[in-house]
């Protein structure tokens, strides 16, 4: 019977065949231990010399790392294994023998591993991170579908930019200029006026020459836009969404979190409501903590965000940033028009901002004024202004960076490990 490593638990004390790759092995004169993987998991195969043909044991000792195999044997309980079972191997069929696999069991430098990213993905740690990424995506669709959101796919090639000031990747669109999308927000706002609540999931591109552990040039973003929604209601949706994702990973990725040696007690504390601190209060807090390099009207850097998040040891919303450091489309704060109704969600443990969101300007005259103040081409934003001409309503939106969120949940140091093939400042291969 052919099965997978993950499904093998359903076949205790039965003979099965599994297609797998050999990740590592060790052997003595009488027994060989094969570390097997098949994409669904990792399992040990035990080959006992006295219980198999001589040719099988010889093959078990000689087979090379990352060779592909069909392995047949009996699934037996093993309490020492994370899975709780292993295979007593009876026969081995080599599908394809690997020679001189470059990523050997010894330690390798990061640049070497990134050069061989197509192979590094096979390792236990990288496999675990990708499984957690997959669960975050699955839980995302589950949350938005249950909450009545409609999935909308905004274009990747655009003629204008929602942020206005961010660096963009430029390309030619026949005889016109075009840019790779840095956000689907403006299109989602239009879709929200048709469907009420919408979300998107797709790649975004930022031509930022940053080398920090938090930044990728190409990253995936989950964005939501909600009509007839105010800022406070939007924050509630955001914290419910993040909490749902964290709980889903804790429930469905126990083995992966254990593989990564993640301290899950920190994730288990994540629950609504998240703490909130205004930008003004955050400035005062940082001053009291000895940060003399930040003044009112300046954006926070990584050390500032980390200090604030560490104070709460939970995801925390920083609200109501100064108008002058935020994009043109954010609604003024009625209590202080030098600030806007926005929030950044800062992840704990130094992972930084994972969500940015705001209430959107819904008044046509004010939005036209903002477009001019930011030096934007009004014609390029005419469709966006139309949304305020024809039945404008209060509405909000937010965007969550997938890779940063996965980095935080999985506990990996750098976001490059959370994308299958990360695009970094000096890396476009493989």
Swiss-Prot record:
It catalyses: tRNA(Asn) + L-asparagine + ATP = L-asparaginyl-tRNA(Asn) + AMP + diphosphate + H(+). Transmembrane segments: none annotated. Its EC number is 6.1.1.22. Pfam families: tRNA-synt_2, tRNA_anti-codon. This is Asparagine--tRNA ligase. Its main location: cytoplasm. It is found in: Cytoplasm. HAMAP family: Asn_tRNA_synth. One of its GO terms (molecular function) is nucleic acid binding. Belongs to the class-II aminoacyl-tRNA synthetase family. GO terms for cellular component: cytoplasm. One of its GO terms (biological process) is asparaginyl-tRNA aminoacylation. The keyword Repeat does not apply. Homodimer. SUPFAM superfamilies: Class II aaRS and biotin synthetases (SSF55681), Nucleic acid-binding proteins (SSF50249). InterPro entries: Aa-tRNA-synt_II (IPR004364), aa-tRNA-synth_II (IPR006195), aa-tRNA-synth_II/BPL/LPL (IPR045864), Asn-tRNA-ligase (IPR004522), Asp/Asn-tRNA-synth_IIb (IPR002312), NA-bd_OB-fold (IPR012340), NA-bd_OB_tRNA (IPR004365). Keywords: Aminoacyl-tRNA synthetase, ATP-binding, Cytoplasm, Ligase, Nucleotide-binding, Protein biosynthesis. Signal peptide: none annotated.
